[in-house]
Each structure stands twice: as C-alpha cells, then as structure tokens.
Design a protein with these regions (language model features):
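Extended, charge-enriched "interface" segments that sit outside catalytic cores
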Residues: 20-38, 93, 97-140
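Low-complexity, highly charged intrinsically disordered N-terminal segments
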Residues: 1-44, 160-171, 190-201
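A phosphate-binding catalytic loop at a beta-strand-loop-alpha-helix junction
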Residues: 71-87
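Active-site cores of enzymes that catalyze phosphoryl transfer or operate on phosphate-rich substrates
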Residues: 124-173, 177, 249-259, 270
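Histidine-anchored nucleotide/phosphate-binding helix
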Residues: 95, 173-191, 215-219
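Short, conserved secondary-structure transition motifs
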Residues: 201-208, 232-246
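Short secondary-structure boundary/capping segments
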Residues: 87-94, 212-218, 245-251
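Residue-level detector of conserved catalytic or cofactor/ligand-binding positions
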Residues: 263-269
Length: 272
C-alpha cells in the first residue's frame, strides 16, 4: 500500500510506483547466473604485451598527457563498506563473547596488521578505557569490534570504503581516496603538472570526503610535484533501490520507505 507520504518521497527521488513494482518483481524472480566457460587467463581474454609493446603503449600515453587534452581520473567512491564487515557485525550480535569462527579468530590474531590498527587502539581507549591488548587479555573482544564499527568509535560500519584506512606503509596508512590521489599524480598529470580527479560520492558522505581531501591533498601535491584539481558529484536518488522484507514487501523504517542508495538490485537481493 502506497501512502501519500510515500508518493511524496518517490516524487522527490524521481522514482515511479511502476519502478518500485519492477524492482520487487526482480527480487521475487531472482537473477539468473551467468554460465562461465573458463576463468580469464592470458590465453582467454587477458592481453599480455611484451616488453616492446609495453614501451609503445607507455610512450603513447606519455605523449598524450603532454598535449592540450584534458585527462580526468574518474573514481566511483560511493560504495558502502558495511558488507565488508558482515562477519564482524554477526560476531557483535552473537550470543557468545569470544571468537568462535575461523574468521573471528583470524581477525584478532592478525589485528595488528590492519592499516587502521593505531586509530582503533585510540578509539578503544576512548570508548572502553583500555587499549586493544588489554581488552583482548580481559576477553572483552566485542568492545574492540564495537569501537571499529559503531559511531562512538571509528564508525567504519557506516562509512564508504573510500574513507577507510586500507594500506599500511612505513610512513603511515592510506585510505583508498589517498591512493587515488597518488595514482593520479603518477599517471594522469598533464604537461603542466595538473591532475584532475573526480569522485562520485553519496550525499551523506560528501563532507567527509571533502574534509579528507582538504587534510591530505596538499601533502601529496608537494610530494609528487603536482597540482590537484579535485571535484565531486553525487549519484541521482532516482537510481536508489527499494529495500524489501523477507515477504518481498517494501521495508519501512519508522513508517518511511527505506531505499538502498548506490547499489545494484542484485546486491540488494544478496543482502536480503
């Protein structure tokens, strides 16, 4: 049943009732699997240029960047990180308090290797009054996971992947956003050292992306001798997907239709 409030929400998003019905029908029917003949390999679909060919392609690209053409590195950066932490969310809600599954055990055994370890350690001290080793020694594993995922801590469970610390280096850790700035400097700078990078982001996270760029871009510009021109755009709300319950009825949050933004319908089906 579509209410007047629903109609107003759909109109604001630019989504028709027919589109909602189509999405629900797709959920019900499911999506056929592709029939794969083989894994991609050098013999099947992957090109492996030899040394001479590599030089030719690299020279061609280098020559192109030295023209007056505008090169823009385009980065879709709206993907949510919540699915990455599915197992940790399950542990947080489990009726046991110590790691039981192989995933849970490995997570805590290797926790110091994560790029976000230092930040998480600080978050644990702030939210639980102890650092990670002390919490683990006391058997308080869930406090560590809560500090990673929840808003009182790092809030990684609600952030897009582009803002999470992913890679660890001797001089610190980098988020994917930072890695794209570095990549842009290495292969997308024009003859004047200008690097154009465009990120698509979700509206609710745009300010966080902007803040991270403001914090980090100048240092990378200095390190690589480039000048960044960084821009953002937001995906249209008309591309949002309706959320459905286990009976394939539109899901409501406090009476309001819930939509999954920036996600394919097939992904939504798996989440259900």
């Amino acid at each position: 049943m579509i209410t007047p409030q629903d109609k107003e929400l759909l109109e604001n998003k630019g989504i028709s009732e027919e589109q909602i019905a189509e999405q629900l029908a797709c959920f019900e029917k499911g999506f056929p699997y592709l029939k794969l003949s083989a894994a991609a390999s050098v013999e099947k679909g992957i090109l492996a240029p030899d040394t001479d060919e590599q030089k030719k392609y690299l020279d061609a690209w280098e020559a192109y960047t030295q023209t007056d053409k505008v090169v823009v590195k385009f980065v879709p950066a709206s993907g949510a990180a919540s699915r990455m932490f599915k197992n940790l969310f399950e542990f947080l809600g489990a009726d046991y308090d110590t790691p039981q599954t192989n995933f849970e055990k490995t997570f805590f055994e290797k926790i110091e290797k994560f790029a976000f370890y230092d930040d998480l350690n600080t978050a644990c001290q702030r939210t639980a009054g102890k650092d990670i080793p002390a919490l683990v020694a006391a058997g308080n594993y869930k406090a560590v996971v809560a500090a990673l995922l929840e808003g009182a801590g790092l809030n990684y469970g609600a952030l897009p992947k582009g803002l999470l610390k992913f890679h660890k280096y001797e001089d610190g850790s980098r988020t994917p956003l930072e890695e794209h700035l570095v990549e842009g400097a290495l292969y997308a700078a024009n003859k004047n050292g200008k690097v154009n990078v465009h990120f698509t982001v979700s509206p609710e996270h745009r300010a966080l992306f902007t803040a991270l760029v403001d914090e980090k871009a100048a240092a990378y510009a200095k390190k690589y001798g480039v000048d960044y021109n960084i821009s953002f755009s937001e995906q249209k709300p008309s591309t949002d997907t309706i959320a459905a319950d286990m009976e394939n009825k539109p899901f409501r949050d406090n009476g309001k239709l819930l939509f999954l933004s920036l996600i394919h319908i097939s992904e939504a089906t798996r989440l259900r």
